[in-house]
Curated annotation (Swiss-Prot):
NCBIfam families: meth_trns_rumB, rumA. One of its GO terms (biological process) is rRNA base methylation. Keywords: 4Fe-4S, Iron, Iron-sulfur, Metal-binding, Methyltransferase, rRNA processing, S-adenosyl-L-methionine, Transferase. It comes from Shewanella baltica (strain OS185). Its EC number is 2.1.1.189. InterPro entries: 23SrRNA_MeTrfase_RlmC (IPR011825), MeTrfase_TrmA_AS (IPR030390), MeTrfase_TrmA_CS (IPR030391), SAM-dependent_MTases_sf (IPR029063), U5_MeTrfase_fam (IPR010280). The keyword Ribonucleoprotein does not apply. This is 23S rRNA (uracil(747)-C(5))-methyltransferase RlmC. The active site is at C349. The keyword Methyltransferase applies. S-adenosyl-L-methionine binds at Q225, F254, E275, N322. [4Fe-4S] cluster binds at C12, C20, C23, C100. Catalyzes the formation of 5-methyl-uridine at position 747 (m5U747) in 23S rRNA.
Amino acid sequence: MSAAIVNAVKQCGYFNQGQCLSCRHIQQPLAQQVAVKTQTLQQLLAPFIPANSAELFLPPITGDDSGFRNKAKMVVLGAAHEPVLGIVSPSGEAVDLCDCLLYPGDMQALLHRLTRFVQQAGLPPYRVDKAKGELKFILLTRSQVRGEYLLRFVLRSHNGIERIERELPALLAEYPQIKVVSVNIQPIHMAILEGDEEIFLTENTRLEERFNHVPLFIRPKSFFQTNPQVAAQLYQTARDWVAEFSPRSLWDLFCGVGGFGLHCASNDITLTGIEIEAEAIACAQMSAQMMGLENVQFMALDSTDFAKGKSAADKPDLIIVNPPRRGIGEALCQSLSEFAPKAILYSSCNPKTLAKDLEHIQGYHLTKVQLFDLFPHTDHFEVLAMLVKD
């Protein structure tokens, strides 16, 4: 990491001027940030770590502290003739965040171009205070493989679609790396990012990403890690840890687009992936097909309900869980304890709920814990924890 990059991030004008405070720790050296996160993690997991077992905590994994983020969620503010893509500042002002240093340079340039696109299309930004206007958000996702993009316009109604379609050919001619464009209709006057209806304006409906030679796909509503550099190391570490157990059968619960399970999969392993979001399951199925995997099944189901419907005889050798911030919950903890697989690999984006879940998983002990700093300058981080049957 170059000194220039570190200094550039520390001199973030948005933060210094109080316009954006999302990166609350940006003025601290990255090493100091990670040290604080490590201490927080160790304190939360201390009740589950035997005495003199500090070696269970492996060195934290970090990446670049700028230019790493692959997704932008821009509120569209201002007026049709002078739109602003960004956020509302703590003082209530519209702040243009196109130059946010978390985004790669090519992404910053495209965000500026999208500002002009909104102006040229004459799309009136949605005014929350007046419940008027059309364009609520612009959501942009970047693939690191070829620098390709998925672009979404979140509208209040169908009224703005014709204007988008009118200006879209010129945008795609200028930016052929935009592979997927869609409109999401969100008619509700509430702080909700997206609605149920998705309308594709391109033939392509998915964006390809690739981690460690594993193809993964992104669709508009499927969750995907926002820091690909560190996420690739997270998936590779999971693959290495799982391989130590030589499992013949594997469950990947809360599997999303299949990142963990597909990294561990082979035709010698029976893999079952469970995820509530149907779009994510469709992506996982595409990946499995592209990889030529035969003993793989991905299903759009609730992970807790899936586990409740299984008996101990159905248990796999190893179970991976990668829940949202709320954790897996007491009911699923009980199911995992009853299944008693050889090991449980828990990937958590919230160490507080990880610790809470560990209280309810019976008959297991931690053997490895590692912190992955997917979210520099914030209090958030990812944790990989290996639990082995007593």
